[in-house]
C-alpha cells in the first residue's frame, strides 16, 4: 500500500467515526428537543395529537378556572388564536390573566393542550424570546415592555433589609 492510499483510508475511517458519533448524539437528543409554537401556529398548522411542544402566549382574561386537586384550566392567546390549556399542579407566583407564559406539554385529540409545566415571565419587561418573535411576526408587538405591575405584586426588598428576613407570601 502506498503512503497516499493509507492516508486516504485513515481520513475515510475518521470521517466514518465522526459521522457515527454525530448520528448517535442526534438520536440521543431527539427525545429532548421540544419545539415552540404560538396559538396561531397550533391552529393553522394542525399539530398532530400527542406531539410534545411548548406553547407560548398570554393568559386570556377571564379564562382561568381553578378546580379541585390543583386542576387549573385557562386559555393561551396571541390575539389571533386561542388554545385551551389544562394543567395540574402549582402555578408560578407570577401567573395571572394577561400574563406572558410558556407551557410545555402535548395536544390531545380534542384540541386541548395538556401542560406538564407552566412558566411565567420574571418581571414586567421580560417576555420569552419566542413569544416576542411570534408577536412581532403578527404585528402585535408593542415596544416598551409589558403592563404595569399589579398592586398586589411583591415589591423588591429595601436596601437596608437583612439577609435573615423572609418574605411573606
Curated annotation (Swiss-Prot):
Domain of life: Bacteria
GO CC annotations on file: plasma membrane
Periplasmic domain ranges by topology: 29-169
Membrane topology reported for the UniProt record: Single-pass type II membrane protein
Any one Gene Ontology BP term: cytochrome complex assembly
Location of region: Disordered: 135-169
InterPro entries the record matches: CcmE (IPR004329), CcmE-like_sf (IPR036127), NA-bd_OB-fold (IPR012340)
Residue intervals on the Cytoplasmic side: 1-7
Compartment(s): Cell inner membrane
Molecular function as annotated in GO: heme binding; metal ion binding
Composition bias type Basic and acidic residues, residue spans: 145-154
UniProt cross-references to Gene3D superfamilies, sorted A to Z: Nucleic acid-binding proteins
Annotated residues for binding of heme: 122, 126
Keywords for the protein's UniProt record, in alphabetical order: Cell inner membrane, Cell membrane, Cytochrome c-type biogenesis, Heme, Iron, Membrane, Metal-binding, Signal-anchor, Transmembrane, Transmembrane helix
Membrane-spanning intervals of the chain: 8-28
Family: Belongs to the CcmE/CycJ family.
UniProt-listed NCBIfam families: PRK13254.1-1, PRK13254.1-3, PRK13254.1-5
PANTHER family: CYTOCHROME C-TYPE BIOGENESIS PROTEIN CCME HOMOLOG, MITOCHONDRIAL
Described function: Heme chaperone required for the biogenesis of c-type cytochromes. Transiently binds heme delivered by CcmC and transfers the heme to apo-cytochromes in a process facilitated by CcmF and CcmH.
Record-given protein name: Cytochrome c-type biogenesis protein CcmE
Taxonomic source organism: Methylorubrum populi (strain ATCC BAA-705 / NCIMB 13946 / BJ001)
